[in-house]
């Protein structure tokens, strides 16, 4: 194998900050994610208007699909690239590209240009989300990570809520739909300036040319081909082509071949693999990645199909169907903050994950009983249960993976986690759509079988016609929820694989000979601000501190003993 010692090939970027400066960094990350989520959730509101303006009624879904595919592709790459080129430089660069892409969306005069710009938005936006978690990993001790990362959650939810409202307001103005992108572009630019000023930075020790030589180019190429082929095949199933079409089979074949090549390259040739295969040799991490995939499946399937259930089967208004998602979103924030606080105080992450998965399983099983006559209160309660499950398990799974890996691998394991989450979301929506359509094709009366081609084709039907097709839709939606329940069962099985060792016992640290290795994070039982109180003024700067000095500043008990 061509692998080198990762810890020696990469420069140290961990830089714990004093509490006031740490809070400023976390708030900056939250502000950036607020802007990103306005864009992500505002687009769907504008799709009908954009389709009419650009004459793209048949292909407008690619505005979202191109972004999702690019996000998934680049979510794999950013972790290792940030190890090589530095977190801050890559983060600010991604924000700059995001701003340019948003501007391009606003000036798009054809569907192809719009889709290309949305892909660029996804490539940069996915990296921003990834790097936000990785930067938080660098500046917050492992034990307190959940607590501070939960501070970011309200910003993301606020962006989710404001996105559709801002989009609707701008669309009615003289700026039309283009105004949303013209608004977000300067906000992204300002966010880049803010991040460049506030975020800590540890400059790479090697030259740019030397860093370029470290990049796993073959691994990046083969992973991109594998992911794009798979995502295009899955995203288009039932919409642009049937799952058994020659196009789908060809895409999946190319994707499979590229995936095998990627595994071989990462195993035999890559000096700094973008995904070290060694992380999959850790059963705990593999199980957590599987749980992340299934969690993404269940969550995204609900976000996509609950409105379809509400509008097509229950004949509720679009406003009501949108409000139904609020319990899932709102409770996730509250529970995520509670879970983060609990992990910091208890020193354990397993309890919150187990409770979250249990709630997810119970909620998903109860959801299979949704039908035409289900009481609205039952629907809301079940969605609250699912939201509690997602909120309690989502972020703690990140902390759990980081606790089971070396420090040098935490950036790539974070990227891998986000990749599996995006992949699970995409597969959840695509497979659920295929289940919905296949069930409708099999059960709809002959005169209405064409309705299986589009979940939004019911708008022009009379109440009498809706009553005729309602049993078929009820059966199809139930099958979708049964598939989500199956994913939840699979997620629960992962609980029997990994164990909670806390934050203090990690024998696989990069430097086993370092006397302070085990002390650095066990001493975090004191608040992080206490760790900083003993630092000299120069030690709290954003610059690099010598390794020996840094160890001293992170071990206050040793300082008290006169180290």
Curated annotation (Swiss-Prot):
Main location: membrane
Superkingdom: Eukaryota
Residues with attached carbohydrate: 5
Keyword Zinc in record: no
InterPro entries linked: MFS, MFS_dom, MFS_trans_sf
Chain positions covered by the region annotation Disordered: 504-563
PANTHER family reported in the protein's UniProt record: MAJOR FACILITATOR SUPERFAMILY, MAJOR FACILITATOR SUPERFAMILY (MFS) PROFILE DOMAIN-CONTAINING PROTEIN-RELATED
Record GO terms (molecular function): transmembrane transporter activity
Segments traversing the membrane: 22-42, 59-79, 89-109, 120-140, 150-170, 179-199, 217-237, 247-267, 269-289, 319-339, 346-366, 379-399, 419-441, 479-499
Protein name: MFS-type transporter M2
Name of the gene encoding the protein in the UniProt record: M2
Membrane protein topology class: Multi-pass membrane protein
Source organism phylogeny: Eukaryota, Fungi, Dikarya, Ascomycota, Pezizomycotina
Pfam families: MFS_1
This protein's UniProt keywords: Glycoprotein, Membrane, Transmembrane, Transmembrane helix, Transport
Reported induction: Expression is induced on squalestatin S1-producing YMG medium.
């Amino acid at each position: 194998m061509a692998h080198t010692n990762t810890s020696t090939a990469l420069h140290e970027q961990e830089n714990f900050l004093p509490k006031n400066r740490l809070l400023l960094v976390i708030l900056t990350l939250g502000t950036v994610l607020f802007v990103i989520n306005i864009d992500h959730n505002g687009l769907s509101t504008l799709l009908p208007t954009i389709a009419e303006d650009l004459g793209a009624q048949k292909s407008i879904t690619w505005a979202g699909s191109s972004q999702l595919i690019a996000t998934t592709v680049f979510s794999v790459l950013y972790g290792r690239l940030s190890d090589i080129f530095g977190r801050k430089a890559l983060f600010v660069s991604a924000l700059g590209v995001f701003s340019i892409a948003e501007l391009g969306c606003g000036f798009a005069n054809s569907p192809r240009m719009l889709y290309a710009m949305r892909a660029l938005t996804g490539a940069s936006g996915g990296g921003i989300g990834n790097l936000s978690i990785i930067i938080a990993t660098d500046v917050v001790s492992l034990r307190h990570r959940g607590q501070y990362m939960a501070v970011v959650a309200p910003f993301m939810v606020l962006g989710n809520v404001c996105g559709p409202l801002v989009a609707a307001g701008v669309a009615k103005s003289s700026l039309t739909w283009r105004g949303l992108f013209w608004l977000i572009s300067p906000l992204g630019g300002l966010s880049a300036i803010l991040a460049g000023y506030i975020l800590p930075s540890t400059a790479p020790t090697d030259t740019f040319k030397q860093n370029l030589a470290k990049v796993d180019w073959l691994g990046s190429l083969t992973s991109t081909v594998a992911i794009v082929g798979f995502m295009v095949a899955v995203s288009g199933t039932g919409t642009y082509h049937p799952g058994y079409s020659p196009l789908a089979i060809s895409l999946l074949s190319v994707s499979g071949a590229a995936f095998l090549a990627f595994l071989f390259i990462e195993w035999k040739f890559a000096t700094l693999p973008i995904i070290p295969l060694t992380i999959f040799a850790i059963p705990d991490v593999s199980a957590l990645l599987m749980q992340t995939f299934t969690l993404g499946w269940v969550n995204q399937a609900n976000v996509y199909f609950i409105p379809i259930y509400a509008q097509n089967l229950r004949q509720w208004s679009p406003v009501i169907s949108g409000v139904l998602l609020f319990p899932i979103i709102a409770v996730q924030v509250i529970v995520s903050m509670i879970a983060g606080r609990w992990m910091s105080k208890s020193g354990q992450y397993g309890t919150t994950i187990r409770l979250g998965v249990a709630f997810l399983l119970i909620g998903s099983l109860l959801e299979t009983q949704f039908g035409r006559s289900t009481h609205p209160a039952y629907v809301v309660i079940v969605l609250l249960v699912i939201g509690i499950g997602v909120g309690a398990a989502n972020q703690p799974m990140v902390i759990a993976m980081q606790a089971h890996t070396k420090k040098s691998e935490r950036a790539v394991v974070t990227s891998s986690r986000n990749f599996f989450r995006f992949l699970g979301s995409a597969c959840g929506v695509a497979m659920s759509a295929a289940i919905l359509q296949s069930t409708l094709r099999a059960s709809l009366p002959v005169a209405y079988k064409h309705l299986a081609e589009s979940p939004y084709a019911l708008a022009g039907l009379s109440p009498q016609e809706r009553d005729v097709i309602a049993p078929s839709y009820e059966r199809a939606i139930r099958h979708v929820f049964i598939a989500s329940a199956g994913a939840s069962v699979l997620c629960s099985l992962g609980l029997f694989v990994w164990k909670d060792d806390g934050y203090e016992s990690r024998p696989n640290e990069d430097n086993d000979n370092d006397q302070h290795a085990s002390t650095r994070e066990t001493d975090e039982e004191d608040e992080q601000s206490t760790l900083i109180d003993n630092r000299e003024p120069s030690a709290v700067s954003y610059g690099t501190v010598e390794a020996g000095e840094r160890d001293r500043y992170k071990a206050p008990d040793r300082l008290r003993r006169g180290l």
